Amino acid sequence: MDMKVMRFLTGLCAILFAASVAHPAALVSTAKDRRSIGLTIYNNELALVKETRQLKLKKGVFSIRFEDVAQKIDATSVQVKPLGGPGFELLEQNYEFDLITPNKLMDKYVGKRLKLVLPPKKEGDEERVVEAKLISTNNGYVYQIGNEIHLWASGRVILPRLPKDLVSSPTLVWLVKGKGDGVQKLDVSYLTGGFNWRCDYILAVSPDEKSGDFSGWVTITNKSGATYADASVQLIAGEIHRVREYPEDRLFYARAKAAEAGAPQFAEEAFFEYHLYTLKRKTTIKDNQTKQIALLSASGIPLKKRYIVKSWIGMWGADEEKGKVGVYMEFENSKAKKLGMALPKGKVRVYKKDRRGQQQFLGEDTIDHTPVDEKVRLKIGEAFDIVYEGRRTEYRKISRNVRQYKMEYEIRNHKDEAITVEIEVRFYGDWQILEASHRWTKETANRVVFRVPVGAKAKQKVSYKAQVVWW
């Protein structure tokens, strides 16, 4: 063999050997290496994933392929920390998410040769395997078979190998410099989209409507692109600020029946300016799964039913209004009233049993995050047997910016029991009530409430005269 050729081959082998030593085959880590995993799930399409894996590392520079991560991972949020062991230095991080699909596989083979399995030309013949060159994938596949160009060739495609730059699942790839040989634990955390949680509550009202059983279910939805087996789960209730918001996801709502919740499975605590709920056991949350877990259960909480009218006429607007009276249920979230747990925002469905013992749906409302010792008011619907009418009976222009007017309301109660109706009236500008037929309470700077008793099968009129000044 020519001496120059020998020298060239020897040099090439040396280069290849050095490259293989400098960049050995990547170490692959999968969910099998996982020693623990935890999730902190937020209300706004977000979760923090925290996991620990155990690997065997070597001294020197090499790559780690960290597989089985969420498809909706925020790669810029990844944190890697060695726990004990020989340790390593993180030199570079990449996130590979060019996932294998039939279309991407074909795109990678443009300009390359492959095999086509074509159907038989006639019945009784065998399938034909031919070599072809893929010329284009634009709006369909174009092949060169021999000296001919074939469009939309029917049949199966056989590829000789999988392209190196396609991955079957999202993968973090780290270039690290190991400080020694040995077993190494990695503490890895990252943020991911595709997670959400909410609360669905059930209030079962007693026959006398003075108390009720209140239960809550946590509904967790996982569309992150990964499964989390035997995970420790925590929930954050509160409005965290984010620079970029993920789109709202549709949720699975709780079962539409007043099912009794099991024993509370979450421990609640204040955390920073939020509230943290920690599941007392581990659970598996599969990809594309909705899971419900009991949050709380309280029996016999005191309830107060309220009838409320919100009057919208006054100095401006129509002269008359007529409508139904809103029905509300109210309770206090306190230990003295058999609750006393910070309630995450969610939907409350209200039920009551009829005289035959059959559960009936009364209505539903949403609540915001509710601290301990705050009141919860739920609008259930509108009263069938209570009618409200309001009209403006007088209107006077005193000066350019001063007006006086008189309002009259009539409440007609067709029920077999006496009730109290609250009429909420709003004012604008500087106002004063000059005269009124009933006592009233100033609730806010611009809102007063008349609490009007109405007897069974009776009616009651309420009137007031007001003066308003605006600038």
Q: Predicted segment positions?
A:
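Long, intrinsically disordered, low-complexity accessory segments associated with secretion
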Residues: M3-F8, V21-W471
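Sec-dependent N-terminal signal peptides
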Residues: R7-I15
